[in-house]
Swiss-Prot record:
Its main location: membrane. It is found in: Cell membrane. F(1)F(0) ATP synthase produces ATP from ADP in the presence of a proton or sodium gradient. F-type ATPases consist of two structural domains, F(1) containing the extramembraneous catalytic core and F(0) containing the membrane proton channel, linked together by a central stalk and a peripheral stalk. During catalysis, ATP synthesis in the catalytic domain of F(1) is coupled via a rotary mechanism of the central stalk subunits to proton translocation. F-type ATPases have 2 components, F(1) - the catalytic core - and F(0) - the membrane proton channel. F(1) has five subunits: alpha(3), beta(3), gamma(1), delta(1), epsilon(1). F(0) has three main subunits: a(1), b(2) and c(10-14). The alpha and beta chains form an alternating ring which encloses part of the gamma chain. F(1) is attached to F(0) by a central stalk formed by the gamma and epsilon chains, while a peripheral stalk is formed by the delta and b chains. Keywords: ATP synthesis, Cell membrane, CF(1), Hydrogen ion transport, Ion transport, Membrane, Transport. Signal peptide: none annotated. It holds the Pfam family OSCP. It comes from the Bacteria. One of its GO terms (cellular component) is proton-transporting ATP synthase complex. The lineage of its organism: Bacteria, Bacillati, Actinomycetota, Actinomycetes, Micrococcales. This is ATP synthase subunit delta. The keyword ATP-binding does not apply. One of its GO terms (molecular function) is proton-transporting ATP synthase activity, rotational mechanism. Belongs to the ATPase delta chain family.
Amino acid sequence: MAEASNEPYRPLTVDVDRWAAAATPEIAHQLFEIVDIVDANGALRRALTDPSRSGEDRARLVHTLLDGRANEVAVDIVAELASQRSATERQLGDGIERTAVLVAAAAAENRGGGHALEALVDDLIRFKSMLDRSADVQRAFSDSRASAEAKVTLARRLAHTESDEAALLIERAVSAPRGSLPGRLLEQFAQWVADRQQRWIARVETARPLGEEQLARLQDGLNRLYGRDLKLTTETNPSLVGGLRVQVGEEIIDGSLTHRLGQLQQRIGA
């Protein structure tokens, strides 16, 4: 694919949380279908990544082409991705693919919270491990003569999962790896889901171990703050001096004495 600009490659991203409440496996499936359309149509791909067109114009083009033909959430996501400047023509398809995985993860989250995300990661890694152990299965999925439908049928026979989201991502990886290897793509899918799973884990560092009552109060406070039942992990770090440090996903709450002293030093220029 031709280069759209000389800008360095970076992932196109959207805030999936904007649509998380409405996320379903079907919306993720439609996003994957849109990836296939973009990959297969060079003229469309160039139009949606053309740096001479404004982001608003590219987003309007998405709505013109897809409104009424795909789920409104899927169309809005693709329009927002297309409105961003792409460094390469492939970048848009990559961004839609990644977002499709995150929408599938959000659908699992809606169904079963952090436990469903953990199970989804396990399903993906388990299937990848099965692939790694069997050269025959690898050859079956890499056989260019086999249809996508045949590969999906084989994946359904081999994947022992009751999760619609896991089935979707596994079938996608083996039937449309977009130039990658199915196992490698499954590993990438699992990493994206695992990144989202971090939103359900609170990593707590304290200068001294907390008692059971303190942990219970902290758990309750964090659950109320984030609006979900977090999994708490604790670690003692004497260098904090006092207080505690909590990380949930990429957000950090630092109430340690060390951090407060550092802030004071910054304010006074020490």
